[in-house]
Design a protein with these regions (language model features):
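Catalytic active-site module of serine/aspartate enzymes centered on a nucleophile-bearing elbow/loop
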Residues: 230-258
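Conserved alpha/beta-hydrolase
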Residues: 48-66
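Catalytic histidine neighborhood in serine/cysteine hydrolases
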Residues: 213, 217-234
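Active-site nucleophile elbow and catalytic-triad environment of alpha/beta-hydrolase enzymes
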Residues: 170-188, 194
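Gly/Ala-rich beta-loop-alpha elbow adjacent to hydrolase catalytic centers
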Residues: 99-103, 107
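Short beta-strand/loop motif that positions the catalytic acidic residue
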Residues: 192, 198-200, 204
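Short alpha-helix in the alpha/beta-hydrolase fold that links the catalytic acid
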Residues: 43, 194, 208-217
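Active-site nucleophile loop of the alpha/beta-hydrolase fold
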Residues: 121-131
Length: 258
């Protein structure tokens, strides 16, 4: 588990969630950057309804106050995910992992670290390095003393839904996601044999859908794809959420029984 300690109270609805299932299978569900477990709660509850043991952790620095996130890095998030995975694997025969956005990045990381994972579900994952000019721009902002920029949360087509995410994006943690997390993973993608369900919103204003196109070509295991016409980045809370819940559980059932 991460050694990071958040100082602010957890926001209502941002709590982690754990469920004891009736089967021998487990599902680890992971939320995204500046978000919290609420964005993946529907996915988690769908797995629970299907009998799965479920772990839905709250990543360090998330779901409290953005000030808590400033000191967090990729290593803190992977430590929390690893702890949740181990809790599941101790009580389950097979485990699937599902993640949104950075949660998708952490899902890829888990599959690479644990090749015994039965399958993974990635929804609009951050999966590719940033362009050098973007990295240079953000590093320049940090050098000038800028720690945050306007938030990237709540990219949702449904006008009746708002993601419970931070209004700002912390730059140092963002750079850690890209440089410590995603960039070193890309050369490893081809080595994995873990089956993947890759869900991609055609209209994503946070993560370019091309990232998923590239991931599908790079990943060594079998890849099934679902393209969404109606939902934006936070698809797990958008118009296509029920279709995602159903597809994720159906995919998990298939790979676990194979």
């Amino acid at each position: 588990m991460s050694d990071h300690v958040d100082q602010s109270p957890v926001l209502p609805g941002a709590e982690p969630w754990s469920h004891a299932g009736t089967s021998a299978h487990g599902a680890l569900c992971i939320h995204g950057f500046t978000g919290n477990p609420s964005s993946m709660r529907g996915v988690a509850e769908a797995f629970a309804a299907a009998g799965y043991h479920v772990e839905l952790p709250r990543l360090p620095g998330h779901g409290t106050a953005v000030s808590d996130m400033l000191g967090t890095r990729w290593e803190h998030w992977t430590a929390e995910v690893e702890a949740a995975y181990l809790r599941l694997s101790q009580r389950c025969d097979r485990v699937v992992v599902a993640g949104l956005s950075m949660g998708g990045s952490l899902t890829l990381w888990t599959a690479l670290e644990h090749p015994e994972v039965a399958g993974i579900v990635c929804v609009n994952p951050v999966a590719q390095p940033q362009a050098p000019e973007v990295v240079e721009m953000v590093e320049g902002m940090i050098a000038e003393g800028v720690e945050m920029m306007p938030g990237i949360g709540s990219d949702i087509a449904d006008p009746d839904v708002v993601e419970n995410s931070y209004p700002e994006t912390p730059l140092r943690p963002l750079m850690s996601l890209v440089q410590d997390g995603v960039t070193p993973m890309v050369p490893r993608y081809g080595s994995s044999k873990v089956p993947m369900l890759l869900v991609t919103s055609k209209n994503d204003h946070v993560v370019d859908p091309i990232q998923s196109d590239q991931l599908a070509e790079q990943w060594g295991g079998p890849v099934e794809r679902i393209l969404l016409d109606r939902s934006y980045h936070v698809a797990t809370q958008d118009f296509d959420k029920e279709a995602i819940f159903e597809a994720a559980v159906a995919f998990a059932n298939r790979v676990i029984s194979s």
